[in-house]
């Protein structure tokens, strides 16, 4: 088979197709360039914008005020496990020993 011309590279999903030899795929490592990261950082800086204002939240028709309505201590009490009023003891089990037949 002839190799593709150097000027025109056929790509699949943004990368060159896999090379096979003897039915097995051969991994080809390509060195990465640092230019793409710098360009990406520049793009991020250009598109950065301040976060949009948070919308007001209504709970049952009243404006919620965040932690003022639900203090962290109240939430902590709601998530604590209730203590049992009586201690539970395991029921006594009869012990059965498996023995071979005669």
UniProtKB/Swiss-Prot annotation:
Keywords, ordered alphabetically: Acetylation, Apoptosis, Autophagy, Phosphoprotein, Translation regulation
Region (Disordered): 1-102
Top-rank lineage group of the source organism: Eukaryota
InterPro entries (alphabetical): DAP1/DAPL1 (IPR024130)
Post-translational modification, as annotated: Phosphorylated. Phosphorylation by MTOR inhibits the suppressive activity of DAP toward autophagy.
Tagged with keyword Acetylation: yes
GO terms classed as biological process: apoptotic process; apoptotic signaling pathway; autophagy; negative regulation of autophagy; ribosome hibernation
This protein's name: Death-associated protein 1
Organism, as annotated: Homo sapiens (Human)
Gene: DAP
